[in-house]
Amino acid sequence: MIKQLTILFLSSLLILSLYSSAVAQTQTPYPDTIERQIKELLKETRTYFDSSKPVKVVKMVKAPKKHYYTVLFTYYAYSNDYLGSATFKKEKDRYTFINGMGSTVQKLNNDTMYLDKVPYSVVYGFNEGNRIKMLRLFTLDKKSSYTAPIKKGTYFIHFKKLPLNTNLEKMKPFYIDCYGKDNKLIPWGECAE
């Protein structure tokens, strides 16, 4: 009888452990503090931000530099939904905002930033139905133009490390081409608007 009770107890413990592990995996992969910080920053920097509507973190990606994370989020202002980005540094289980707060009503946006004094070009966007397979970014500094392969997913972020002596003002893309399945050019209106 004791053997049966022991087996029953251990089985129950195993099932409970598996259940709690599954519940932990379904929780959000980012802390609530990030969402709160973004909402506060939007209140401070966007006079048109509608704080009665939710701010939703839709993607969090580890940046190329250790301890940095870039977050994509959506929010509502005027009569439009916006897609924004912000970069955080993780220190001792705390996330501190360090850069960003760029946003767009379009499906694509790009920016430049420094992470530990290293320059990066960042392009992010909404990729409904995984239509976009690749972006080609043309810059004023033609030698810095580059191609960004886009991973599958509803939202994407692509980082491009730049040489240390890069003039970030010349890195702002003035033209972006979108390519879909079979490397076919997607018209800008379909790609970004």
Model-derived segments and their meaning:
Residues 9-17:
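Bacterial N-terminal signal peptides
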Residues 99-124:
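Extracellular ectodomain segments of secreted/surface proteins
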Residues 88-102, 189:
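Short beta-strand edge/turn micro-motifs at domain boundaries
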Residues 18-29:
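Sec-dependent signal peptide cleavage junction
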